[in-house]
Amino acid sequence: MIKERKGDLLRSDAAIIAHQVNCQGVMGAGVARQIRHRILTAEQYRAYQQLCRKNKEELLGSCSLMLRMDTGATQYVAHLFAENIPTGRGLDTDYAALRQSLTAMMFLAAQRELSQVAIPGYLGCGLAGGDWETVYSRILMPLFSESCFTLTILYLPDSIRRLWTEFGDIPMNPETECIEQAWHGFSAGTHREEIWHWFEETFQISVAEALMYANNKKKIMR
């Protein structure tokens, strides 16, 4: 099952919070940087770096779990090794490796009898250059839609705006007001109002106030 909502990954109470990492031992930007500074202990970060130094060539497509130490609850951080060398230019995310690392995470979670997983919206699609529609429709949906796991995708306000912009780029029949190609789990032929309602129900916002007008784009929910 896949759920989507507004939220901060680092505040999730899911049993596992997962993010993409590279195989070079660097968490220098994006969600990885936040996790490094706000969640991981210095010892855990050194363990990640050591893992990369010793197993760099074998890490791509794997997953490493670390127990979160800053809360009283039992929660793990999943490092998804889906990026080899971070260049920040073009596509650094390896889609096949991302699928493999998520599959590896599911195996590790099942061993621990854990079923609740959270990821950030646009996983692998920030500086790593991935395409979110590819990640969502070709990787996440096949893996999680019919699985025993509950995957919660948490979007920050900027990511919600980005998703809305991408929806606006989908070809739409001007007469029927239906999208002409599948997008984000919606089949071709879906009326735009159905997708608008999905945005409002999923993210608890008003499309008109928060997304449709340029002068309100920075006003999105607080």
Regions found by a protein language model. Give the residues of each.
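Macrodomain-like recognition of ADP-ribose-binding/processing modules
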Residues: 1-118, 122-222
